[in-house]
């Protein structure tokens, strides 16, 4: 029989409930302290051993990263605290279908490694807007994508991560929200701003191990508590809250009864909350943007030792993406079984009493399971898991945002900036972004509408498809030009913003209180909207491109798939501007080590700004660029990677078929 969690709050209070502090024993606190010591130690170690004194060293880890930390960082950058809270919450509300969104990444991470990355590496770029500049020429595409990417990082990615992490921290420690967020961001900022991408990737590797270990232990406790898998499937379908009436509302049984297709990933195309055509096609379109053209993800792969290491990292990440179903979604469903009245509450006043949120408490499924089920010590380990997922994602976002700002925006403002100036600008912007993220927390608090993961998916569906369309056509269709790409992005942005603004104005509603948004705007499921927006963008891009002049092949060598293996010299569309910047940068002299004061030398040592050796000659720079743009592989390792990719695809087909 499903048990319920008795609220420990006085019903008469008008304020949000004050949850008793759960982590206040020596065992839990010791585990958390050890976690922070280990993470900071790894961050300091990677700062000392890595080259942080150049743009390539700071932003791309010197192009010398092995496959296993790179693959772990790919996974950790994607799996944040918003996944633990969001996936578990949606699982508690509607079943396992949301896990198929994670499995969708298995295919796209292989497309990234085998199709998109060879082009990016051949192009010799640091950022995705930089690739668009090389591919199409001009500045407006690069600047637009940089600004939009920074907005998405702050408004969507960072906000959802901080919100979900704050839920857990408040429940566990009873800290003030802003104090908890400030402490986390301060520690995160230290090794992100000082250490660069190498520091981020190595700490991500440690945090991936902690995430997997802690969530595996919790999964074991959860299934043991519920009586095994068969008992789990039976009890979930009976997990109905005891309070289903109140507040003068007539609540439909479908709002509090588990869905009949809760244990199927493919659901009705019309009435399903995650319709199968939207899951297969809509989420694949979003995955093209996120996994193949998003700065946070692609930057991790651009730092690999060689192409084989890059592909191996993608394969490792693909296998790890099989786990969220079992480590997050199913534990969230078990939380509904064990604590039904809290997690599955449906009456607004009851939800306010249970978790302080009228729209529902499914986002509290995973934190509640951790705090109620885990013993002392292991509870501290699970808080460390949440901190690990939160901090690993934030470090990835902060480092990538610094890269975007420095390479794509700051160089437009300061065309004669030296390498040292670019390094300082990147670090300062990282701190600015952290400050903006803290200021964004109040907006995050008022945007906790419904299920967090659906919020992330819907906003992504309104902004991401045009970007995916541009990158896909840029690589596969050389006839596309700058005018087509720009106007395709503009039309896609306008259409997406109409839907996004309408949902902010009218609200997305809930099962109990549906939204009043006009059906013609909000009546289409966000996954279907992503498909429509994607093809609208493609039509505009191709239409405008065919009506305007094509780009000569001499500017496209090794920038699109049909000209990938061309060995002729490419003439960049912005070659003259780049030469001017290089001459200006080379003319600036750096101050010598001896001329600096003690304080300045200490700051330079912390931030990796110490001199790293004599300036390279033009011949040495050309040889280095040739090395970094090399995509060749040894035949043996190419075969091994291809076999593993086929095996991973087979596993993906099997899990989809088994849970269909």
From Swiss-Prot:
Q: What GO biological process, any one, is recorded here?
A: D-glucose transmembrane transport
> Which cell locations does it reside in?
Cell membrane
Report what the protein is called: Solute carrier family 5 member 4B
Q: Identify the GO cellular component terms for this protein.
A: membrane; plasma membrane
Ranges in the topological domain labelled Cytoplasmic: 1-27, 76-82, 127-142, 188-208, 299-313, 402-423, 477-484, 548-639
Gene name for this UniProt entry: Slc5a4b
Lineage, top-rank taxon, reads Eukaryota
Segments in the Extracellular topological domain:
49-54, 104-105, 164-166, 230-277, 335-380, 445-455, 506-526
> What switches on its expression?
Significantly increased by cadnium.
Residue ranges of the TM segments: 28-48, 55-75, 83-103, 106-126, 143-163, 167-187, 209-229, 278-298, 314-334, 381-401, 424-444, 456-476, 485-505, 527-547, 640-660
Q: Which reaction does it catalyse?
A: D-glucose(out) + 2 Na(+)(out) = D-glucose(in) + 2 Na(+)(in)
Task: Please spell out the taxonomic lineage of the organism that makes this protein.
Answer: Eukaryota, Metazoa, Chordata, Craniata, Vertebrata
Q: What does the UniProt record say this protein does?
A: Low-affinity sodium/D-glucose symporter. Generates D-glucose-induced depolarization in a pH-independent manner.
Source organism of this protein record: Mus musculus (Mouse)
Tissue-level expression? Expressed in small intestine. Expressed in kidney.
Indicate how activity is controlled: Inhibited by phlorizin.
An example Gene Ontology molecular-function term? carbohydrate:monoatomic cation symporter activity
Family, per the entry?
Belongs to the sodium:solute symporter (SSF) (TC 2.A.21) family.
Does the keyword Cell membrane feature in the UniProt annotation?
A: yes
- Topology of this chain in the membrane: Multi-pass membrane protein
Q: Which Gene3D superfamilies match?
A: Sodium/glucose cotransporter
What keywords is this UniProt entry annotated with?
Answer: Cell membrane, Membrane, Transmembrane, Transmembrane helix
């Amino acid at each position: 029989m499903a048990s319920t969690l008795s609220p420990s709050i006085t019903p008469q209070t008008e304020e949000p409930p004050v949850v008793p502090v759960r982590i206040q024993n020596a065992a839990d606190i010791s585990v958390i302290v050890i976690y922070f010591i280990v993470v900071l130690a790894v961050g300091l170690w990677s700062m000392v051993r890595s080259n942080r004194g150049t743009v390539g060293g700071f932003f791309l880890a010197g192009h010398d990263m092995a496959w296993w930390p790179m693959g772990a960082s790919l996974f950790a950058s994607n799996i944040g605290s918003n996944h633990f809270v969001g996936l578990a919450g949606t699982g508690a509300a509607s079943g396992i279908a949301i896990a198929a969104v994670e499995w969708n990444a298995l295919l796209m991470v292989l497309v990234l490694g085998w199709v998109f990355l060879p082009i990016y590496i051949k192009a010799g770029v640091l950022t995705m807007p930089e690739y668009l500049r090389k591919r199409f020429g001009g500045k407006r595409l690069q600047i637009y994508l940089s600004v939009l990417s920074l907005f998405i990082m702050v408004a969507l990615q960072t906000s959802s991560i901080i919100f979900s992490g704050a839920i857990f921290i408040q429940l566990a420690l009873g800290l003030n929200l802003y104090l908890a967020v400030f402490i986390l961001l301060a520690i995160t900022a230290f090794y992100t701003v000082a250490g660069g991408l190498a520091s981020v990737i190595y700490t991500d590797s440690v945090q991936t191990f902690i995430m997997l270990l802690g969530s595996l232990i919790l999964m074991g406790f959860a299934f043991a508590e519920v009586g095994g898998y068969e008992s789990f499937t039976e009890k979930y379908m009976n997990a109905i809250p005891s309070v289903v009436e109140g507040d003068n509302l007539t609540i439909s049984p479908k709002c509090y009864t588990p869905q009949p297709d809760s244990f199927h990933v493919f659901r009705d195309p019309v009435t399903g909350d995650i319709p199968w055509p939207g899951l297969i096609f809509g989420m694949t379109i979003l995955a093209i943007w996120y996994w193949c053209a998003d700065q946070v993800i692609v930057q991790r792969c651009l730092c690999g030792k060689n192409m084989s290491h890059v592909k191996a990292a993608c394969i490792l990440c693909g296998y790890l993406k099989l786990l969220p179903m079992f480590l997050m979604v199913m534990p969230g469903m078990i939380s509904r079984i064990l604590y039904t009245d809290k997690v599955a509450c449906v009456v607004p006043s009851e939800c306010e009493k249970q978790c302080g949120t009228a729209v529902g408490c499914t986002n509290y499924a995973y934190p509640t399971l951790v705090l109620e089920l885990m013993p002392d010590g292991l509870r501290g380990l699970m808080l460390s898991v949440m901190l690990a997922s939160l901090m690993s994602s934030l470090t990835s976002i902060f480092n990538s945002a610094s890269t975007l700002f420095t390479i794509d925006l700051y160089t437009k403002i300061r065309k004669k900036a030296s390498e040292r100036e670019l390094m300082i600008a990147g670090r300062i912007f990282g701190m600015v972004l952290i400050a903006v993220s803290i200021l964004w927390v109040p907006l995050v608090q008022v945007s906790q509408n419904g299920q967090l993961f659906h919020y992330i998916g819907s906003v992504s569906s309104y902004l991401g498809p045009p970007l995916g369309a541009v990158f896909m056509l840029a690589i596969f269709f050389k006839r596309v030009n700058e005018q087509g790409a720009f106007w395709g992005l503009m039309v896609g942005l306008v259409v997406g913003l109409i839907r996004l603004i309408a949902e902010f104005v009218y609200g997305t509603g809930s099962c109990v209180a549906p939204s009043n948004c006009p059906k013609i705007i909000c009546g289409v499921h966000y996954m279907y909207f992503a498909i429509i927006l994607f093809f609208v963008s493609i039509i505009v891009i191709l239409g405008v491109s065919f009506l305007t002049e094509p780009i000569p092949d001499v500017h496209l060598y090794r920038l699109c798939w049909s000209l990938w293996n061309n060995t002729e010299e490419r003439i960049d569309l912005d070659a003259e501007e780049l030469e001017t910047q290089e001459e200006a940068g080379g003319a600036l002299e750096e101050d010598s080590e001896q001329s600096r004061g003690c304080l300045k030398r200490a700051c330079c040592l912390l931030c990796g700004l110490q001199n790293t050796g004599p300036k390279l000659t033009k011949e040495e720079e050309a040889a280095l660029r040739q090395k970094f743009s090399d995509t060749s592989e040894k035949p043996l390792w190419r075969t091994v990677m291809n076999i593993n990719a086929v095996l991973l695809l087979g596993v993906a087909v099997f899990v989809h078929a088994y849970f269909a």
